[in-house]
């Protein structure tokens, strides 16, 4: 995921649960987030403004950069949790007290998986470090057992792998080396949970049962699947040509929400041609929601958006009547991504964020009282993406 325009599209389109985020221009971090090897701990973040260290790599005082916007009426007491580099896709555990997130900073060539407390303290890396044979990673979630599930390429060798071939235009690579892994709470004893001959990633978890939903192209198309927390009972959930990905369960696990492309004609031919090269062109994605049947398949699928733009990172409110998603539909140039809220039937849409750069990857806490999201706001260095926590106000 990368988080800035025009790289913002990379953010919705990098291998991730939700989508891409803008790319950072620098990786200076203040304060530095400790890795699992240092066993150190960061202090909790301070509401509304960044910590009193006041400089994030380019000398601008924290007070000069806006974290809380007066016209974002649903967000109060906005708190910055990370400071510098690329930090995105922060997801709550079932208790609402911990988060996993993707982090790229301090000169790293690709994202690593971190875990931290919901106040921003105790940041540490839980995916293998490059020094220990780590690879490219994406999309992590905490199971009810406290184990961490994520996708990684490190089973096929260390390193970040090559970037996608830009001669094909703006494309995102669905690395066939991605497999789904599970590890202990601090990243210990990682093992493969699901592996096919192709791309297996974007795993998220039902907080009630631990069932996992993910994306795979093992049948030749990018489809949604689900499985038990131990890797058993794998079921294919979608069967329509196009990229189905970035799926999440609702809090009660009765619904699944995701983003998908539905190309036809020449666009379908282009999609299938690129997929044979492990590439996806992610400029047109819509939001879908479906009920989860007793046999764990999907039923009563509804298309929520139909605007032909890049829509991604959907997440259900715990009341199951509303959802959040991220879109560039408000910017004629397609570079500014904001968070929107809409009813499940597509009515009553409202813009939630107004920051004139990137806001994305929203997730409600299990009780619906908090919202965690990623943003380019309050940047210490141009291109930084950080994680923010806010009180949600209806």
Whereabouts are the PLM-identified features?
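Blade/loop signatures of beta-propeller domains
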Residues: 51-76, 178
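Predominantly a core beta-strand signature of beta-propeller blades
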Residues: 77-80, 121-125, 170, 177, ...
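A flexible loop/linker signature enriched in serine peptidases of the S9 family
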Residues: 83-86, 103-113, 129-137, 151-179, ...
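Residue-level detector of Asp-centered blade-edge/turn motifs that repeat once per structural unit
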Residues: 94-95, 143-145, 207-208, 251-252, ...
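Hydrophobic beta-strand positions that form the internal "hydrophobic ladder"
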Residues: 99-100, 148-149, 212-213, 256, ...
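Short loop/turn segments that connect beta-strands within beta-propeller blades
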Residues: 117-121, 184-188, 228-232, 292-296, ...
